[in-house]
């Protein structure tokens, strides 16, 4: 009976630690993803140009598309 009790306690501790590890992983992913700015945030802060604005490179446009020296919508 004592061996069964010890075995159950060990199993409970292992399951508890596994649950803690899995709980931390999504939080780390959320922190990583939240550091990225949305297109609207980048535009609002002036880091990229909006639609129909003069451009010379794709990276200047929020959409990432510079066609005919003007930023595309999408």
From Swiss-Prot:
What is the predominant subcellular site recorded for this chain?
secreted
Asked if the Swiss-Prot or TrEMBL record annotates the protein with the keyword Secreted, the reply is yes
Disulfide bridge map? 48-62, 55-66, 61-71
What's one Pfam family the UniProt record gives for this protein? Conotoxin
Which cellular component, as a GO term, is one annotated location?
A: extracellular region
Listed A to Z, the keywords are:
Disulfide bond, Knottin, Neurotoxin, Secreted, Signal, Toxin
| GO molecular function terms attached to this record | ion channel inhibitor activity; toxin activity
Tell me the tissue specificity.
Answer: Expressed by the venom duct.
Q: Could you say which residues form the signal peptide?
A: 1-19
The propeptide sits at 20-46
Q: Where in the cell is it found?
A: Secreted
Q: Hey, which family's this protein in?
A: Belongs to the conotoxin O2 superfamily.
Q: What is known of its domains?
A: The presence of a 'disulfide through disulfide knot' structurally defines this protein as a knottin.
Identification of the protein by name: Conotoxin VnMEKL-0221
**Organismal lineage:** Eukaryota, Metazoa, Spiralia, Lophotrochozoa, Mollusca
